A protein has these predicted regions:
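Alpha-helix-loop-beta-strand connector modules within alpha/beta enzyme cores
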Residues: 138-167, 201-208, 257-268, 313-327
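Short acidic amphipathic segments
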Residues: 50-65
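N-terminal amphipathic alpha-helix/helix-capping segment at the start of soluble metabolic enzymes
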Residues: 69-105
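Short, acidic/polar
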Residues: 49, 106-117, 170-176, 283-288
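Active-site mouth loops of central-metabolism enzymes
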Residues: 93-113, 166-168, 274-282
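Catalytic beta/alpha-barrel core
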Residues: 6, 127-129, 142-145, 162-172, ...
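Glycine-rich, proline-tolerant flexible connector loops at the mouths of alpha/beta enzymes
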Residues: 123-149, 303-308
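Catalytic alpha/beta core domains of metabolic enzymes, predominantly
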Residues: 194-306, 318
């Protein structure tokens, strides 16, 4: 059961709701949004009488939701949630870009270069990769110490320039470093989506998050993980899509993005960096447009993986998407 407080509900009114929940033998989970606070009642809901809560001061409505994602659901809060990072608002209906930091870049030079990018223009934030691994078995492994030192230095220079920085982590042991470098956003790779300890730790933070699903996950996995984080109190969640299985490798998960957009109110990021390599045959601009129309309001791009033009007649397709038939 979800109790939605009014926009200007006071702390005293919130305590009144919590008191009634506890008197019924239930426990509460609180999620504080920018405009409204949601209170989840956890326990045997057979003792729950919605009208007794609707009569309390400060309560806007009570919603009985049976799905596994409740705090983040459209039933609890129909309007889109907004996540604000250094005065930049994510999720308000305009497309924004999060851009991977290029090797050797400095923030101001990267911004000047990105502003001339004909595909997506100036990024709203940069993504640092202090824990990047070599995916190819015979590729030289990155120097972990150097990568972390560079990420810290980059973060400090970005802050001096007023540019938000996200830090990508892949497991719970890396969270402390990301917090230590004062990242504006914690970007959690799909590897950690179903890590319960990670979900609980993220929920206790007061830091914006990008919570990613990988090709091995379902959209339901995505929403359940976000709900676990929200139940711990952190409502600053952006859903991140790292693709779905395709015939030639991961593809943009248009169906998953559309499903999540319909089911929950959280902003959605589509990682199109893996799909803008030459063998994808779609430009970053085209992929971003597809993602935006599916429901994503943020895209992650990689300036070092530029799109090559198709060699045959300008025809384009994407791995996992059928090529249009010739007439």
């Amino acid at each position: 059961m979800i109790i939605v407080m009014r926009e200007k509900a006071t702390e005293a009114e919130l305590r009144g709701v919590i008191g009634l929940i506890r008197r019924l033998g239930l426990s509460e989970r609180i999620s504080r949004g920018v405009e409204r606070t949601l209170v989840g009642a956890v326990g045997d809901e057979r003792v729950f009488e919605p009208r007794s809560f609707e009569a309390l001061p400060g309560v806007e409505k009570v919603a009985r939701i049976v799905k596994e994602w409740r705090m983040i659901s459209r039933e609890a809060r129909p309007q889109d949630a907004i996540v604000t990072v250094r005065k930049r608002r994510f999720g308000e209906g305009r497309l924004r870009a999060l851009r991977l930091k290029g090797a050797g870049d400095d923030p101001e030079a990267a911004l000047r270069l990105a502003a001339r990018d004909p595909d997506l223009g100036e990024p709203a934030a940069f993504l640092a990769e202090p824990f990047a691994d070599a995916l190819r078995p015979y590729a030289p492994a990155p120097d972990p110490k150097a990568a972390r030192s560079e990420a810290k230095s980059w973060s400090e220079r970005c802050k001096a320039s007023g540019i938000p920085v996200a830090c990508r982590i892949r497991n719970l042991s890396q969270l402390e470093f990301a917090l230590g470098m004062s990242a504006d956003v914690i970007y959690v790779a799909g590897d950690a989506l179903n890590d319960l300890d990670m979900n609980q730790a993220l929920g206790k933070l007061n830091v914006p998050l990008v919570l990613c699903k990988g090709p091995q996950h379902t959209p339901e996995d995505w929403l359940v993980a976000a709900e676990r984080v929200a139940l711990r109190g952190n409502a600053q969640i952006i859903l991140g899509d790292e693709g779905a299985p395709g015939r030639l490798g991961p593809r943009l998960d248009v169906e998953g993005i559309a499903f999540a957009k319909a089911q929950c109110n959280l902003p959605i990021l589509a990682n199109i960096s893996a799909f803008s390599a030459p063998n994808a045959n779609l430009s970053p601009r085209a992929l971003a447009r597809i993602a935006f129309e599916a429901g994503a309001s943020i895209v992650l791009t990689d300036p070092e993986r530029r799109q090559a033009k198709p060699e045959s007649g300008g025809q384009t397709d994407q791995p996992g998407f059928p090529r249009p038939r010739q007439q």
